[in-house]
Amino acid sequence: KFSRLKNQFFFFMKKKFGWEKVNNNWAAVCGGCVGMTFIYERPDLMKKISQRFLDIMYEYLNGFGDDGACAEGLDYWIYGFGYFLYFADVYREFTGGQTDLLDDEKVKYIAQFQQNMYLSGNAAISFSDSSRYAYFERGMTDYLKTYYGKEIIPPDNKFSCEKPACSRFAHFIRSYLWRDEYKAYNQDDDFIFYPDAQWYIRKLNSFGFAAKGGNNGESHNHNDIGSFIIAYEGKQIFADIGAGEYTSDYFSENRYKYLCTSSLGHSVPIINGYAQKDGIEYNAEIIKADKDEFCLDISGAYGIEEVRAVIRKFEIMSDTVILTDEFKIEGERCNIIERFISVINPEYI
């Protein structure tokens, strides 16, 4: 058994892997796991190739804008940033404190991402391949609170995850080793805007609201430019379905035939019979983003020549959201279907 493991270390040193050059969670997960294995099992070899693992971690961080938003969604923040954190902790100890990957302004902003994703109770922002209801990893959250102090606001402990997804040992063991007792703070009446990701978040005493621009070529992308979520009393009222069932077909060229990834499964209009298109070139233009209003042009998501502008404006009040869509279309054809997604059956009053 040891001989087989020994051969794997030298095999790794002679070969480059695709996940070393990706700007998503996979770089941190794979690089972090392999890097920690080298530190624990072959620290002598780690001293020779440590820069390789640092480069992998920097590739991961390059997938974030300076605002710290994880365009892949909260679930992949937990996955990717979790393993980045675990590696950073072990590597800091390995270097005797000389290299601290967490001592960085951008990394601090990334660490704050989780606390901004809770809208009402554990009804969360489920953009991209994420879940409508969030359960946080207690160990990594408490560690970040200890490290960054008041900059980190832990969610309510009743929403902590006691059974890590896929039985991931790294999350599980740290939920015991790093567990601490921190008070959850109320985030009512809060406003967050991520300018790079173009995510808008408004939390009030009565409800939580989120909307997004961005582009349709993001990692774990959904065609969802202009989509929004309204959460109330712990439930998404206007919903983002979130991730679909993971199959090979879901990650193939057929991805946008699924309702949850297509714009047909999001609260955005159908214009002249067309849904939004996928690709980084299909994007939004932000017009205004402040505490009371979020306004953007989503026409670029459709790639329709005669559609000159689709100005979507959200006005946020204490107990109301007013949505106004303004269409500028050339030619005689102007067929608009407004589409709203909810998992709650409407009732006539």
Where are these regions (language model features)?
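Active-site lining segments of carbohydrate-active enzymes
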Residues: 1-75, 173, 177-184
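Short, charged N-terminal helix-start/capping segments
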Residues: 1-24, 138-159, 222-225, 231-246, ...
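Conserved structured core elements
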Residues: 28, 47-54, 71-74, 78-85, ...
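A residue-level signal for conserved active-site and pocket-lining positions in enzyme catalytic cores
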Residues: 34, 114, 325
